[in-house]
Amino acid sequence: MSIATDTNIGARSDRLVEALAGPAVDLILVTDLVNVRYLTGYTGSNGLALIGPDTRVFITDFRYVEQSAVEVDPSFARRQTSTAVDLADELPNVLPAGQIKLGFDDSHMSVAQYGRLGGILGDRVTLVPVGGLVEELRRVKDAEEIEKIAAAQAIADAALEALLAGPMIGRTERELALQLEHDMRLRGASGPSFDSIIAAGPHGALPHASPRDVAIEAGQLVVIDWGAQVDGYASDCTRTVAAGEISDTAREAYELVLSAQLAAVDAVTAGADCFSIDAVARQIISAAGHGEHFGHGLGHGVGLDIHEAPTLSKRIEAGADELRVNDVVTIEPGVYLPGEFGIRIEDLLVVTAGAPRILTSIPKALRTVS
């Protein structure tokens, strides 16, 4: 169990209430557990929150009564259902009287759940979709959130340095991934922030490859994409290393990706257009003839979820979104040659009004391992 230590949790609900004026709703029902955690501090697996100008209610079932008493911000009244079947059954007992416009997160609710919720609440409650409202609040991180992400990245960095100090050639991708994840836990992480990727040679040309029971061979590039989780917050980083001597083609491709990554990092600052930052890296890679081999976006936000707003990608419109102070984002260009190798270099950054704060400490010059 994790005890919430954020001093800003109560203020988050206040900010959410201010945001309710946009969609013109009286209250919001928060059901996604990551959003519930952000607003209340609760880390269990069954809970919801009802928030309005004069309402702060948290609902869970018997299994989490003691946990919620420790974790949930004291500004919330805590309620318990008699069963764990549907916490929404308790809502009629806590909603204010009269006609109500109730916001709900349609991006985290199935059609079946929506139908059941409407049946529970009846005609006096009008359900209004407000998907993404809490996620928008979560985007810009406060100081405590940033330090948790920084702590997660420091653990991840130390674990990778320990892995690279030992032998890799002859060991399997899966064996190395398990060692990396075990080491992060020993160093204080609650676990990996996502399933680690260790992919050698042609397998590295799959951007989201899964580690195999296949030994790494001399002469291969090895893509390592990993992260740690600390108090719910994620880190994310990628390094590509050389297992012994590699070909000139692979080395040149690595230097290309590195130059694109460095240029994109230099472009990160508050007010910068998210589409344009992606274009900085993409143009460098395309000019070298590898545009078709860089198919994913340049980066994404990181926080309680491993993928959050903002998105830095060619798939968004130019001018649609700008970086903000205290966005936490990845910069991760890559080149993937099917049947040959893959290369990705990724840092985790905090956006400032000037140059970004780079949370990743591992050097990016090509490293040769044994």
Question: What are the residue ranges of the model-derived segments?
Answer:
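Active-site neighborhoods and metal-handling regions in enzymes and metal-associated proteins
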Residues: 1-370
